[in-house]
Amino acid sequence: MVETLVTIRTARHGDEIKIADVHDAAWRDAYRGIIPGRELERMIARRGPAWWRNAIARGSRLLVLDFDDRIAGYASYGRNRVPALAYGGEIFELYLAPEFQGVGFGRRMFEAAQKDLADHGYRSFLIWALAENVRALGFYGRLGGRIVRRAPEKFGEETRERVAFGFD
């Protein structure tokens, strides 16, 4: 029998390359055909290892899911960036490498971020998703989120709708 260790922990120095790899793969999988190609490439390129190294060094709230010594996903979160919405916290990003999706790791990452937000006084929080990202909409809906706001988001010359899920 083979045992595989799955842990969720705070990102640390040395994780930046693996987080950047997950970001690249997850964004290509989630947004190809939704975000215009050139814009998608530009957005991915901005989030290379140096960006993640700086986020870790700044002490950003950033969790990673470590599966058998491989970073399979990450979540970043903190204070809500839209004060007009009455939610204290926000999960900014929650992504898994495509090969780790659909096995419960996303829920585990969500619950870990939710717990840390609550531990820091944020009992309610938001998560934004693009309206065309059907998998994300289903995922956040199954977790109990309800759509509380719709807003446009520009990607180059094109506009897409994004939706905010509220969790109380």
Segments and roles (model prediction):
Residues 60, 160-164:
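Short hydrophobic/aromatic beta-strand or adjacent loop that forms the aromatic wall/cage
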Residues 22, 120, 142-143:
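Structural motif
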Residues 97-99, 103, 131-132:
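Active-site acidic-Proline motif in GNAT/NAT acetyltransferases
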Residues 3-6, 10-16, 21-99, 107-112, ...:
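Acetyl-CoA-dependent GNAT
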